[in-house]
């Protein structure tokens, strides 16, 4: 299966630039009777933001949920940390802080 075919199966989220509302295709839009798993491109032309009633043109693609943040072309740089999701980065950062704290506390045990 090609990379392009894989990208098309993922449902991208779209964010309203006016109010910050995020349309998530997995949930749909119960206010306008939009079924779950409906891609943004298949929404009716007269669909508007449920919060501020902005048109579809006011939305920008923010990508699928749970993916690495940043531009796709930059994910290969660095030590591999760029490919981690935000939740994985939080675990890495706070885990390292906790280990560092435990290390410095363990120095009190030295005589």
Swiss-Prot record:
Keyword Protease belongs to the record: no
UniProt-recorded Gene Ontology molecular function terms: electron transfer activity; iron ion binding
Cofactors, names only: Fe(3+)
Family the entry assigns: Belongs to the rubredoxin family.
Name of protein: Rubredoxin
Sites where the protein binds Fe cation: 16, 19, 49, 52
Cofactor note: Binds 1 Fe(3+) ion per subunit.
InterPro entries associated with the record: Rubredoxin-like_dom (IPR024934), Rubredoxin_dom (IPR024935), Rubredoxin_ET (IPR050526)
PROSITE patterns (alphabetical): RUBREDOXIN_LIKE (PS50903)
Residue ranges constituting the Rubredoxin-like domain according to the UniProt record: 11-62
Membrane-crossing residue ranges in chain numbering: none
UniProt keyword terms in alphabetical order: Electron transport, Iron, Metal-binding, Transport
Domain of life: Bacteria
The organism of origin for this protein: Trichormus variabilis (strain ATCC 29413 / PCC 7937)
Function comment: Rubredoxin is a small nonheme, iron protein lacking acid-labile sulfide. Its single Fe, chelated to 4 Cys, functions as an electron acceptor and may also stabilize the conformation of the molecule. Could be involved in hydrogenase-linked redox processes.
GO biological process: alkane catabolic process
